[in-house]
């Protein structure tokens, strides 16, 4: 099968590797050359994916069997036409359109499906944001409707923060939508990602919950399994099943939840492998998240997903701008037991850009806090150089 991969970052790279292993053809697409997934693809294209005519051109050129989006900044409205042409959009044109924009997915979850979410409003200007803040109360969280990896996300604690939050959200927005969501701050005990695998002809499956920590709106560490009560887990699985069934199609979804004293709150959803799910590369499961996504897309039956080890991953961050980043200290990771790493191969670096991850695992009986601490220490051993 021929797969057109729209977005060629580190998640796309791991997906492309998984696809290569079972004989699939990958055409990797992004808006800059030598993106990570392009380095392991059969062919690549460099285009502005928000340009519908450019998308049409490469779809007509390559005639893919599948279109797999990896990022948000895509002219997803074109996907409906590609489905009419007989191309499978992953997980579906509807899912891709709804989840590329926080407004559509939040309204689906809260208004149509009745899932428990934080109180929220939308704003298209700093003045509207001020009204939204008054409606939901402070503290509150502001996010662009279209963004990734926490870009443009901030917390408003005082009235003086509103204009700054608006400007930061606009700067961090992807695509051409200048609108934000402002939501009441949920007093949560922890956050989890529930990797949810929707299959074409088989039941929906769930991975063991993944815990994660954010800083500057970006994921720093994730671990599996996360601690959660049976009651909260069943509630999260029920919500994840409802929202993925409403979106339709097959593939892996990363569904995020807040765990609170008041139960489980739906937060966000990504219709593709999730940043936090890279912990599955530590060998925590019988299939990692990229293999699960691929198998679901290709309608290869997945009998079950088993948790085999406890694991954690932590990011390797750049500290400076470079057009030719190099790495030191990798040998310090290589000599450690139960440990591994990935260098993404990004051609340039900038402060706080994720350049790789470290991975570690242990037995299911090992306290997860010990494994997370180990991963955090490992990440400090690798330096990104100019």
UniProtKB/Swiss-Prot annotation:
Residues binding ATP, per UniProt: 102, 143, 148-153, 183-186, 191
Enzyme class, UniProt record, top EC level: ligase
Record GO cellular component, one term: cytosol
Binding site for Mg(2+): 256, 268
Keyword rRNA processing: no
GO biological process: 'de novo' IMP biosynthetic process
GO MF: ATP binding; magnesium ion binding; phosphoribosylglycinamide formyltransferase 2 activity; phosphoribosylglycinamide formyltransferase activity
InterPro entries: ATP-grasp (IPR011761), ATP-grasp_carboxylate-amine (IPR003135), ATP_grasp_subdomain_1 (IPR013815), PreATP-grasp_dom_sf (IPR016185), PurT (IPR005862), PurT/PurK_preATP-grasp (IPR054350), PurT_C (IPR048740), Rudment_hybrid_motif (IPR011054)
Keywords: ATP-binding, Ligase, Magnesium, Metal-binding, Nucleotide-binding, Purine biosynthesis
Catalytically driven reaction(s): N(1)-(5-phospho-beta-D-ribosyl)glycinamide + formate + ATP = N(2)-formyl-N(1)-(5-phospho-beta-D-ribosyl)glycinamide + ADP + phosphate + H(+)
Domain ATP-grasp, first and last residues per copy: 107-298
Subunit text: Homodimer.
Family classification: Belongs to the PurK/PurT family.
Name of the molecule in the record: Formate-dependent phosphoribosylglycinamide formyltransferase
Organism annotation: Flavobacterium psychrophilum (strain ATCC 49511 / DSM 21280 / CIP 103535 / JIP02/86)
Gene that produces this protein: purT
